[in-house]
Swiss-Prot record:
SUPFAM superfamilies: EF-G C-terminal domain-like, P-loop containing nucleoside triphosphate hydrolases, Ribosomal protein S5 domain 2-like, Translation proteins. Catalyzes the GTP-dependent ribosomal translocation step during translation elongation. During this step, the ribosome changes from the pre-translocational (PRE) to the post-translocational (POST) state as the newly formed A-site-bound peptidyl-tRNA and P-site-bound deacylated tRNA move to the P and E sites, respectively. Catalyzes the coordinated movement of the two tRNA molecules, the mRNA and conformational changes in the ribosome. This is Elongation factor G. One of its GO terms (molecular function) is guanosine tetraphosphate binding. Gene3D superfamilies: 3.30.230.10, 3.30.70.240, Elongation Factor G (Translational Gtpase), domain 3, P-loop containing nucleotide triphosphate hydrolases, Translation factors. The lineage of its organism: Bacteria, Pseudomonadati, Pseudomonadota, Gammaproteobacteria, Moraxellales. GO terms for biological process: ribosome disassembly. InterPro entries: EF-G-like_DII, EFG_II, EFG_III, EFG_III/V, EFG_IV, EFG_V, EFG_V-like, G_TR_CS. The gene is fusA. Residues 8-290 form the tr-type G domain.
Length: 708
């Protein structure tokens, strides 16, 4: 089968935003104008096409990133038909992992901002993730028809809060109820969309006289920015003071792909104005798969050297599984992004992470929540494979003769845990299956059994995250569960360097046990990338080489269960530098025990402390409740980092607050502000716990030990 759409006409994009910026409505309009859905689905009435999980439609927020394919040839049919694969990403901070994994497989992104709310905390998180994966992006300032909409304020915030260089391609004609359309700064024409045809038709007119001066000022900035793309353009601009439309467009495209600028558009998706222009910008300025650097990976050779895969159908097949989902009708769906080569239905792929071959049953293309079966997928495609048995998010699938392992995604450790048990004993097995499936879909969700209490513990990125998973268990698997009080994921670490001896000697009739080590323990940054390091500086064979691994193992096992209060230990560098052994009695177990003993004693001598997760909290409140809310944050051991005035007499407070103090905050905040304040929270860092709080946690742990 030949390729239907040339690769240069592919756009793999994500539409990403803060919760209420109107991202789902924007995506709906995209699907409407590109002809996929003939009736526009509104979030208000729970009918949006992309929000296909029941809870999403109920809560009006997007949780999972559904992938959808559509086609666009421009507002005036001025382009050849382009294929746009859209990955819809959630905007709630508890689902940051979803954003992270979709960013990994995108070539470009559309950031949607609310013209009233502007750049919000989640927007900053998404921006950081886009920076991490170097995703070229454009921005769409939505809700221009809302009271308090201010295009120019949001442009300023993108500069100051996100550190981007926004270059408006349009400016709004009117605002709030009087928002009528936009001035296109490239062609210097005013565009008005026709309301009767839901924005399918539009008019081009002369720029309104009152906007002429502003349009010229912003046009000059646009041309100046474009001229910076190359030296030739800059010379031409300095000579003639102008560039042609084609020169501007190709320069803006180059600068966007190089992540130098953020082209900016605006409109109101709800009133069907401006999304059409955004689609044109996706085609004009965002990259095709071959415009971004070739994907890197580790080759399957002796040196595990680094290799790349060019975006070409001729290259060996390589793809990344970025999402696993359960479908009632077809079972397991593995969403993949194809980076190179071709995959046919019924053929086999190799998973180098699991070292397994798997046969591909069916390949389906998702159209929001309907599916179309495909015979093959090629470079640049995003589709779902049915029936993959042992693939997890982040795994590579490739050609067995040309193995490559693409860079894996980094998944954050959970910060909150709950005990969960089925309401009826009969549901125990069903609950285990349900939790296993949910954990396979979502790498930031973990399940384990507490060895002491025998309880099932689930861990995730926030209260809402776990609430929704418990809810899904009930809906999709028919398991009702009781949940316990939330538990915080504390950590233990040390502050000083110590040297410590550890000896394990057992003498019973016959062969005994003998292990003897000296360890140096040094603190490392508990927030760094490396949380534990083991070094060997043994001179003269005082501890034989074959036992070094056992010492390391003994230390790591002790670190898992903590010393101070039973929490995992992080930020320690352990050096084995001396010891002794016995020809007959020494074995691996003896040295494992000696390592564990030395570590435990050394840890307690190295000024140990507890760390707790600290959250970045942003509260937006009417000024009248400001004092109460600030006082409450202080009572919760919060540190206020800054404040900002928002339109309409609203204040924004930014603070860092320990997670342990944030349980039940939503209820408290609502009652203090009569339901008018809103807040968002995301994990910021691990920080040392004040002595009095730490002592309470440690004594609780010691009492539990005494009871047992």
């Amino acid at each position: 089968m030949a390729r239907k759409t040339p690769l240069k006409r592919y756009r793999n994009i994500g539409i990403s935003a803060h919760i209420d910026a109107g991202k789902t409505t924007t995506t709906e309009r995209v699907l409407f104008y590109t002809g996929v859905s003939h009736k526009i689905g509104e979030v208000h009435d729970g009918a949006a096409t992309m929000d296909w999980m029941e809870q999403e439609q109920e809560r009006g927020i997007t949780i999972t990133s559904a992938a959808t394919t559509c086609f666009w040839s421009g507002m005036a049919k001025q382009f050849d038909e382009h294929r746009i694969n859209i990955i819809d990403t959630p905007g709630h901070v508890d689902f940051t992992i979803e954003v992270e994994r979709s960013m990994r497989v995108l070539d470009g992104a559309c950031m949607v901002y609310c013209a009233v709310g502007g750049v919000q905390p989640q927007s900053e998180t998404v921006w950081r993730q886009a920076n991490k994966y170097k995703v070229p992006r454009l921005a769409f300032i939505n809700k221009m028809d809302r009271v308090g909409a201010d295009f120019y304020r949001v442009v300023e915030q993108i500069k100051t809060r996100l550190g981007g260089k926004p270059v408006p391609l349009v400016i709004p004609i009117g605002k709030e109820d009087d928002f009528e359309g936009v001035v296109d700064l490239v062609t210097m024409k005013a565009i008005y969309w026709d309301e009767a045809s839901q924005g399918m038709e539009y008019d081009e007119r002369e720029i309104p006289a009152e906007l002429q001066e502003k349009a010229e000022e912003y046009r000059e900035y646009l041309v100046e920015s474009a001229a910076e793309a190359t030296e030739e353009l800059m010379n031409e601009y300095l000579e003639n003071g102008e560039l042609t439309v084609d020169q501007i467009n190709s320069a803006i495209r180059q600068l966007t792909i190089d992540n130098e600028i953020i082209p900016l558009l605006c409109g109101t998706a709800f009133k069907n104005k401006g999304v059409q222009k955004m689609l044109d910008a996706v085609i004009q300025y965002l990259p095709a798969p071959m415009d971004v650097p070739a994907i890197k990976g580790i080759l399957d050779d002796k040196d595990e050297s680094e290799g790349t895969r060019e975006a070409s159908d001729e290259a060996p097949f390589s793809a990344l599984a970025f999402k696993i989902m359960n479908d009632k009708f077809v079972g397991n769906l593995t969403f993949v992004r194809v980076y190179s080569g071709v995959l046919k239905q019924g053929s086999s792929v190799y998973n180098p992470v699991k070292m397994k071959r798997e046969r591909v049953g069916r390949i389906v293309q998702m159209m929001a929540n309907s599916q179309e079966e495909l015979q093959e997928i090629r470079t640049g495609d995003i589709a779902a494979l049915v029936g993959m048995k042992d693939v997890t998010t982040g795994d590579t699938l490739c050609d067995e003769q040309n193995v490559i392992t693409l860079e894996r995604m980094e998944f954050p450790d959970p910060v909150i845990s709950l005990a969960v048990e089925p309401k009826t004993k009969a549901d125990q097995e069903k609950m285990s299956i349900a939790l296993g499936r949910l954990a396979k879909e979502d790498p930031s969700f973990r399940v384990h059994t507490d060895e002491e209490s025998g309880q099932t513990i689930i861990s995730g990125m926030g209260e809402l995250h776990l609430e929704i998973l418990v809810d899904r268990m009930k809906r999709e698997f028919g398991v009702e569960a009781n949940i316990g009080a939330p538990q915080v994921a504390y950590r233990e670490t040390i502050r000083n360097t110590v040297e410590q001896e550890g000896k394990f000697v057992r003498q019973t009739g016959g062969r005994g046990k003998f292990g003897h080590v000296w360890l140096r323990l040094e603190p490392m940054d508990p927030a760094g990338d490396v949380l534990y390091e083991f070094k060997e500086e043994v001179v003269g064979g005082t501890v034989p080489k074959e036992f070094h691994g056992a010492v390391d193992k003994g230390i790591q096992e002790r670190m898992k269960n903590g010393v101070l209060a039973g929490y995992p230990i992080v930020g320690v560098k352990a050096t084995l530098y001396d010891g002794s052994y016995h020809d007959v009695d020494s074995d691996e177990l003896s040295f494992k025990m000696a390592g564990s003993i030395a570590f435990r004693k050394g840890f307690m001598a190295a000024n140990p402390t507890l760390l707790e997760p600290v959250m970045k909290v942003e509260v937006e409140t009417p000024e009248d409740y400001m004092g109460d809310i600030m006082g409450d944050l202080n009572r919760r051991r919060g540190m206020v980092q800054g404040m900002e005035d928002l339109p309409g007499g609203t204040k924004q407070i930014r603070a860092e607050v320990p997670l342990a103090e944030m349980f039940g905050y939503a209820t408290q905040m609502r009652s203090m502000s009569q339901g008018r304040a809103t807040y968002s929270m995301e994990f910021q860092k691990y920080a040392e716990i004040p002595k009095s709080v730490a002592e309470a946690i440690i004594s609780k742990f010691n009492n539990k030990d005494d009871d047992e």
